[in-house]
Amino acid sequence: MSRNDSGNFLISEEDWSLHRKGFDDQQRHQKKVQEAIKNNLPDLVTEESIIMSNGKDVVKIPIRSLDEYKIRYNYDKNKHVGQGDGDSEVGDVVARDGADKKQGAGKGQGAGDQAGEDYYEAEVSLMDLEEALFQELELPNLQQKERDNIVHTDIEFNDIRKTGLTGNIDKKRTMLSAYKRNAMTGKPSFYPIYPEDLKYKTWNDVTKPESKAVVLAMMDTSGSMGVWEKYMARSFFFWMTRFLRTKYETVDIEFIAHHTEAKVVSEEDFFSKGESGGTICSSVYRKSLELIDEKYDPARYNIYPFHFSDGDNLTSDNARCVKLVNDIMKKSNLFCYGEVNQYNRHSTLMSAYKNVKDDKFKYYILKQKSDVFQALKSFFKNEESGVSKASYEI
């Protein structure tokens, strides 16, 4: 709207859809990014930029299946002529480049003579990444335990009123109310909006009893666990920790590191400090049983032990490990063992665990980075139990 020389206002009309073109393009791009994230989850969960982000809200991750569009110079200046067989359709290939193939981009130890593969580095919200990952995960075999006397208070927006805080205006219901009132006067429109049209979302305080769970995160930090093995184990525990704290109200996590001896450590030390020495896995199982006896009564807690190692255990200790694992399973909902074994070498610990015959025992062997995602799905797969998670809060 503009003013002419005579002082009157003129109303001009234009195609406002053109103003949305940039927004629509952005929306389409974001949708492609989300689809690429979902399709590349097995590779993205072990990206170093995420694991080392310390929980930052936004991280940059490479998405190799998504092209970043740009103009590229055509180095092949030859002209090509193609001829079909007479019944070709749009999109059919009628000719191919006859130029000799070059060596290509360098891979492995050899040097290549071509440019490398470009990939798109996207800024992704850690919350969006977690949403894509956690929607398939759930604590398995979750059971109803003896309730604590403690209850927690939650807020639920479950009512609509005519008065309330400005920040809680329900825009959709307000506009519908205005439209209905204006329609009754013969002028159906969203404008004007009067005070009596305003609708406000309001909340109620809801108290819910707590049923608790504890996860025992056990990691081998001995000398046989190299940089890659520790990175794989910590990647798993990084996502496990974020998953538990995102989806569950009350869950305790105990971090236990071990070599020949086991000790409870802080979360920061668990994810940062390295140690050396030999490997006696029974030490970490004894420490877990001590924690259960001292702090976590099985009658009141759902107990989930997770142990990650490279499987290189003292051979004479394997029989003790099997006995202690069976003792732990009598008090826990599940026992999960993850073995980082990149080269498929002989594992003394895994050979002993093959004799464990209990439905509560689950294991996964990780040979490559994408196996972290598969291990999460395997260990946190929802299984039928006496009481489902949806029936009560944890």
UniProtKB/Swiss-Prot annotation:
It comes from the Bacteria. InterPro entries: Spore_YhbH, UPF0229. Pfam families: DUF444 (PF04285). NCBIfam families: spore_yhbH. HAMAP family: UPF0229. Belongs to the UPF0229 family. This is UPF0229 protein RBAM_009260. It comes from Bacillus velezensis (strain DSM 23117 / BGSC 10A6 / LMG 26770 / FZB42).
